Design a protein with these regions (language model features):
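C-terminal membrane-associated helical module and adjoining short loops/tails
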Residues: 1-7, 12, 17-18, 36-44, ...
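Short, conserved structural micro-motifs that define repeat-unit consensus positions
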Residues: 4-25, 72-80
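Active-site His/Glu-centered metal-binding helix of metallohydrolases
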Residues: 16, 45-53, 70, 74, ...
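Membrane-embedded alpha-helical segments that form the functional core of polytopic membrane enzymes
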Residues: 17-63, 79-95, 148-160
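Alpha-helical membrane-protein architecture signal
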Residues: 35-38, 63, 67, 103, ...
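Membrane-interface helix caps of multi-pass small-molecule transporters
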Residues: 52-56, 110, 140
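Cytoplasmic-side transmembrane-helix entry/capping segments in multi-pass membrane proteins
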Residues: 67-71, 95-96, 121-127
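Membrane-helix boundary/interface segments in integral membrane proteins
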Residues: 100-116
Length: 184
């Protein structure tokens, strides 16, 4: 299933950066926060680069379609749990985001087993950008000023809406596949 191309290697690298992020955050020091911000930004950058390269080089793989979103979720979930444990993020925000991410992951895996593979949508990409910006803001800015709170609320809203969009899009694809002449 793993195809050793640069986009897939970047996805694996992103997964490997997750423990470094957690260790840096949980050190709970100014230097640890700087390191965590750098690691998180670097890992997030690999998400954009691997997607761009996969499309530009026509090297999109099933591994990439499945593991790229999973790597994103691991990165975000690890950061959220770490920030909640440090009391730098409200637990309800993390729970809403994590619940959405887990639900979409379960739906994605179920769809794949049914032969339906759905890549990331524009809405999902916007959600990912907002989550990255929000997590970076919480890591970098202590005390959560109003603009960080607004960013977090917008992120939660878009996260929920993109989850609903994914669910209804998947349902539509399954219905099309099951319809007579729909390929299912």
């Amino acid at each position: 299933m793993f195809t050793p191309n640069l986009p897939n290697v970047l996805t694996v690298l992103r997964i490997m950066l997750v423990p470094a992020l957690v260790v840096a955050l949980l050190g709970n020091t100014p230097a640890g926060d700087v390191l965590a911000a750098v690691v998180f930004a670097l890992a997030s950058l690999t998400d954009f680069v691997d997607g761009y390269l996969a499309r530009a080089r026509d090297s999109v793989t099933t591994f990439g379609k499945l593991m790229d979103p999973l790597a994103d979720k691991l990165l975000i979930v690890a950061a959220l749990i770490s920030l909640v444990s440090l009391h730098r993020l409200a637990a309800w925000i993390a729970m809403v985001i994590i619940t959405r991410e887990l639900a979409v992951t379960v739906l994605r895996l179920g769809a794949t087993q049914a032969g339906v593979v759905i890549g990331a949508s524009l809405f999902g990409k916007i959600k990912t950008c907002l989550q990255i910006a929000a997590v970076l803001a919480v890591i970098a800015v202590h005390g959560q000023p109003a603009w960080v709170s607004v960013l977090l609320y917008v992120t939660v809203l878009v996260t929920v809406l993109s989850g609903l969009d994914y669910f209804f899009g998947l349902r539509r694809r399954i219905q099309q596949a099951q319809a007579p002449g729909g390929g299912g």
